[in-house]
Amino acid sequence: MTLRKTSCIAVAMAVCALAFTAPALAAEQPMQAAIHEGGQLFAAASLGTKGNSCMTCHRGAGRVEGMLPNGKKIPSLLGAAATFPKYNKRAGKVITLEMQVNSCIANGLGGMPLSSSGPKMVALVSYLTSLSQGKPVDIQGVKE
């Protein structure tokens, strides 16, 4: 095989590789942007009226054990998104991650609930879901 044919084959293979990776990279950029925006919202006091942010209770950007204002310890949010939907005893029903986020916004931050499909909720859920990357999905009531 000549050098020219080898070069043409190498270029063709590179073009094919780019054709397969470009859509994945294009999809990754908006996801990374949503995760970043969610992290910003998580740290901002703009979701409520009490001057608090999500990090008031969920310390370390949700990556470490937190504490409620009453002193009750709460677990880190690492892997938490992978546990939804789940049954909530206090609510007496199955809740989604979006419902839990809105409960925290309304009760903890004194804010107005977000639209479950609005851009702020999508960003917050994207951020919280990123904290579950690589964690096993925990489906209540299912035994392995």
Question: Language-model segments: what does each one mean?
Answer:
Residues F20-A26:
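Sec/Tat signal peptide C-region and signal peptidase I cleavage site
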Residues V15-A17:
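Classic N-terminal secretory signal peptides
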Residues A26-A33, A44-E144:
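Electron-transfer interface patches adjacent to heme c in soluble/periplasmic c-type cytochromes
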Residues T2-A12:
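Bacterial N-terminal signal peptides that target proteins for export
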